[in-house]
Amino acid sequence: FLDKVKTYMNEQVEKAVPIYKRSVDTHEARERFRLHGMTDKDRLFRYRRVSRVNLYSLGDFEDYYYGFMTYDTSYLKYFGLYLYDNGFILQMPEKKAPETVPAANLSPKVFQVQRESERWGEQMGISTVADLNERITKGNIQQMMLIAEALQEQKIAKIAEQIAEKKTVKFVLIAGPSSSGKTTFCNRLSIQLSAHGLTPHPISLDNYYVNRVDTPRDENGEYDFECLEALDIDLLNQDMTKLLNGERVELPYFNFKTGKREYKGNFIQMKETDVLVLEGIHGLNEKLTWSLPAESKFRIYISALTQINVDEHNRIPTTDGRLIRRMVRDSRTRATSAKETIAMWPSVRRGEDRNIFPNQEKADVMFNSALVYELSVLKLYAEPLLFQIEEGEPEYQEAKRLLKFLDYFVGVPIEDIP
């Protein structure tokens, strides 16, 4: 079957079938969606604050797509089709090599946690943005929020139970990309570990940064805080080994203002029920904790995989959700503007591709921190930040794209969160 699909796609590429774009008013677009049986799009545009919609057609097929479309099918000649699970993967080139189709990056554990999150969404009756918007406007969003939180808490409780059952585990290593929710998860897991009779000690790996003057620099001469060598690996292993052997250790504190390591009398000595919960982007990299016995470590990977789609034909990129999370967080806790966050995001993403994603399948357990309703909450905080970016600034187009994306969602005031 897949060979026939690929043959047909290649035939369409050879024919260079044009893709037409036309702008229609929203009322007409909704009528056409209903005509085509696309009720998800009809419901979606009930909440869009736009007067016109761009529709695209290929032959007799007409649809709406979030993002830009090419002129004709001849531009789509580079692709790969691979059977996977109960479906298939459509593999496209990456921006850095537009004429090369990379091998399919199969990540079974990531795929399974995505499927789990989709099941949670189906359990709540929410699989698209339209489903979410309808729940919000009908006023029964709070129950759905409580269910979403409860499902996550059940998962965290099960992870804590797994750790408690492994009597040899002394180090819980938590890793994940930027704004995936590592710190929040670390705190929630610590509560569940306490409920199992353990004494958790949350430790941020950021406190093991080398002094700023010793931080490696990237290809542009800028400090590379996201490479493994930005951490004092020798000191970390020395401290953790001493703790494992029952010695009393003073843990460091990294002062981000001075860029130097400090000691503030934070002493720890591990007893039988003590567990160290280490959180940082390199937590799953074996080079980070090379001296610690394998049986003493339990690895957890945190992702933020959005479990709903814009509609049946348009997905929500996971990176968009994390970027919006980071924008709001940086503004509230680090006095960083949305403009600055957007400007540094490509560098953050490069660091993730290099240092984090290659290690994700090493996890003993994966946890998806994304909540089905979170973009509706973040919308009210992110939009004012994005509107501060002026036309003509390098980050304006990205800000405009994110504003368009957030416009799909009906906002939820913070006071409505249980």
What are the residue ranges of the model-derived segments?
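Auxiliary tRNA-acceptor-end handling modules of aminoacyl-tRNA synthetases
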Residues: 1-154, 159, 166
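Conserved NTP phosphate-binding and transfer environment spanning the P-loop NTPase/kinase superfamily
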Residues: 167, 286-418
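Hydrophobic anchor at the beta1->P-loop junction of P-loop NTPases
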Residues: 172-174
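Conserved glycine(s) of the Walker
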Residues: 181
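Hydrophobic positions on the alpha1 helix immediately C-terminal to the Walker A/P-loop
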Residues: 184-189, 204
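Post-Walker A helix-loop "phosphate-sensing" segment adjacent to the P-loop in P-loop NTPases
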Residues: 191-201
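Conserved nucleotide-sensing/catalytic segment adjacent to the nucleotide-binding pocket
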Residues: 201-203, 210-258, 275
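Glycine-rich phosphate-binding loop used to anchor ATP phosphates in small-molecule kinases
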Residues: 237-295, 342-359
